[in-house]
């Protein structure tokens, strides 16, 4: 229903317009208060790069963060990541992740980023606290913040916005009548716009998500995903249909698809009930980090990598590497 409202297919968005106007007013006043100096942002002693979005829902932001961190690491840059840690509930903040930190404490995306990149990661409701904790524990040249474009309490040196190239901005209205957190004109003030799928417009960096080999959660075995049959597909991400479409593009026709809420906590009983012994459960890598401690032999996940071959992506990386080495 929400997807139909935000896309403009359902007329119910009109009923939510008063709340959207209020949301837009409040968000605009908050940003203006920082621009005019009424509120002060905390500035880190190292450059901060924000990877965020203008809309609610999955846009492919986490794969971009992983891509960015890995590319900077290949250039010799010591980079750390901070996040709000949605879906996690630690006893105290800030929380600096280690290899044993669970998604129940830190949230699924921070754990995934840490496992994929090996980069230092910290979470806290106040992102400046997470930055301070990282810098106290590690000698870093740059901080990447996963989400937080609208978290103006943390000063930033570069802003990168990720857009779903198919859905873009839906009906264009602020939450809750539409998907917008800020007006589309905000793109004019950011340093780079990355478009996930669809068709990139002039000045935007096109990106696609390339699926890898399916990985068994229990054994680590890798297999071509197209060899699977009798598949149940599970996705607890911002936009589950994207994962299901990816499977179909790989030649997989699931007998059942299960769309879960983003950051939803998962239990062994709940997940096991989705699949029979003769079926294969295929899930996203983001879901897999929540299931590793109780995985079964027929549970697999499909990792994806962000691919950006555009020259503008290379210019962005060169700019960030130069910024980190100042």
Swiss-Prot record:
Q: Does the keyword Lipid biosynthesis apply?
A: yes
Q: Which cysteines are joined by disulfide bonds?
A: none
> Which reactions does this protein catalyse?
a lipid A disaccharide + ATP = a lipid IVA + ADP + H(+)
Record's superkingdom? Bacteria
Q: Which GO terms describe its molecular function?
A: ATP binding; tetraacyldisaccharide 4'-kinase activity
Fetch the InterPro entries from UniProt. LpxK, P-loop_NTPase
Q: In which pathway does it act?
A: Glycolipid biosynthesis; lipid IV(A) biosynthesis; lipid IV(A) from (3R)-3-hydroxytetradecanoyl-[acyl-carrier-protein] and UDP-N-acetyl-alpha-D-glucosamine: step 6/6
Q: Name one GO biological process term.
A: lipopolysaccharide core region biosynthetic process
GO CC field? plasma membrane
E.C. no: 2.7.1.130
Q: Where does ATP bind?
A: 55-62
Annotated keywords: ATP-binding, Kinase, Lipid A biosynthesis, Lipid biosynthesis, Lipid metabolism, Nucleotide-binding, Transferase
Q: What does this protein do?
A: Transfers the gamma-phosphate of ATP to the 4'-position of a tetraacyldisaccharide 1-phosphate intermediate (termed DS-1-P) to form tetraacyldisaccharide 1,4'-bis-phosphate (lipid IVA).
State the family named in the UniProt similarity comment for this chain.
Belongs to the LpxK family.
Name of the protein in its database record: Tetraacyldisaccharide 4'-kinase
Q: Which organism is it from?
A: Klebsiella pneumoniae subsp. pneumoniae (strain ATCC 700721 / MGH 78578)
């Amino acid at each position: 229903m929400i997807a139909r409202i935000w896309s403009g297919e359902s007329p119910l968005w009109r009923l939510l317009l008063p709340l959207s106007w209020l949301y837009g007013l409040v968000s605009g006043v908050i940003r203006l208060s920082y621009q005019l100096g009424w509120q002060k942002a905390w500035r880190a002693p190292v450059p901060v790069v924000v990877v965020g979005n203008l809309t609610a829902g999955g846009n492919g932001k986490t794969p971009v963060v992983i891509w960015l961190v890995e590319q900077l690491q290949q250039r010799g840059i010591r980079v750390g990541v901070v996040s709000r840690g949605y879906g996690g509930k630690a006893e105290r903040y800030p929380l600096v992740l280690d290899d044993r930190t669970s998604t129940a404490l830190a949230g699924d995306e921070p754990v995934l980023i840490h496992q994929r990149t090996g980069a230092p990661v910290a979470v806290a409701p106040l992102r400046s606290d997470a930055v301070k904790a990282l810098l106290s524990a590690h000698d870093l040249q740059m901080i990447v913040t996963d989400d937080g474009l609208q978290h103006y309490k943390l000063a930033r040196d570069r802003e990168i916005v990720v857009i779903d190239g198919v859905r873009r901005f839906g009906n264009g209205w602020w939450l809750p009548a539409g998907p917008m957190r800020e007006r589309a004109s905000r793109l004019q003030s950011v340093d780079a716009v990355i478009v996930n799928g669809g068709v990139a417009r002039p000045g935007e960096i096109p990106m696609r998500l390339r699926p890898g080999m399916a990985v068994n959660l229990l054994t680590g075995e890798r297999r071509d995903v197209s060899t699977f049959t009798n598949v149940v597909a599970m996705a607890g991400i911002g936009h589950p249909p994207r994962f299901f479409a990816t499977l179909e593009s790989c030649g997989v026709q699931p007998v059942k698809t299960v769309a879960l809420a983003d950051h939803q906590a998962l239990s062994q009983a709940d997940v096991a009930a989705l699949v029979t012994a003769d079926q294969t459960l295929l899930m996203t890598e983001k879901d897999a980090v929540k299931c590793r401690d109780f995985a079964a032999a027929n549970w697999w996940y499909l990792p994806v990598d962000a691919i950006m071959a555009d020259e503008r992506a290379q210019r962005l990386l060169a700019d960030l590497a130069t910024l980190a080495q100042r």
